[in-house]
C-alpha cells in the first residue's frame, strides 16, 4: 500500500475529520512515508503505522516518537487483531474489507480515484457510519517571471465515517 506521501494540506483535512483526543489510539493503514502518523503522533496516546513493507523513510521519520509502533502487516489483519479509536486508510487495496472489520469511532479513507471513494462511501453507508466525502483541491505557489503562480496538487477524496 505504499505510495506517494499524503500532502500536508490533505493531512490537515484528515485531522479535522478524525479529531483525535489525547487518550486515543490511532492507526495509519498504508502508512507509506509515515507523514500522516508523524502528524498525528503528538496528539494521541499511541499511534500504529501499518504497511505491508515499512519504508526506510517512514522508519527514519517516526523513530523519534515513543508512542509510535511500526507494524509490517496487512491492514485487514491489523484490524482483526487491534481496536484503534481513529483510523486513517491511505491505501486502496482491500478498503471495503477493512471497513467491514473496522470498529473505530471515526475512520477516513483517502482516495485519488472516484471509484475507490464511492466504494468506501457505499461500504460506510452499509455500516451506518458514512458522513461525507470531501474533495480536497489545493495549489501551491511557485516563482514565475518575477511573480507568483500556482501549481495544483492532485485532488484527493477524503471519505469520512463516524459512529
Curated annotation (Swiss-Prot):
The alphabetical list of record keywords is: Cobalamin biosynthesis, Methyltransferase, S-adenosyl-L-methionine, Transferase
The Gene Ontology biological process annotation of the record reads: anaerobic cobalamin biosynthetic process; methylation
Q: In which pathway does it act?
A: Cofactor biosynthesis; adenosylcobalamin biosynthesis; cob(II)yrinate a,c-diamide from sirohydrochlorin (anaerobic route): step 8/10
- Kindly state which reaction or reactions the protein catalyses: Co-precorrin-6B + S-adenosyl-L-methionine = Co-precorrin-7 + S-adenosyl-L-homocysteine + CO2
Give an example GO molecular function: S-adenosylmethionine-dependent methyltransferase activity
Residues annotated as binding S-adenosyl-L-methionine: 6, 30-34, 51, 75
Q: Which CDD domains match?
A: AdoMet_MTases
Enzyme Commission code(s) on record: 2.1.1.196
Return the similarity comment: Belongs to the methyltransferase superfamily. Archaeal-type CbiT family.
Name-wise, this protein is: Probable cobalt-precorrin-6B C(15)-methyltransferase (decarboxylating)
Q: Which organism is it from?
A: Archaeoglobus fulgidus (strain ATCC 49558 / DSM 4304 / JCM 9628 / NBRC 100126 / VC-16)
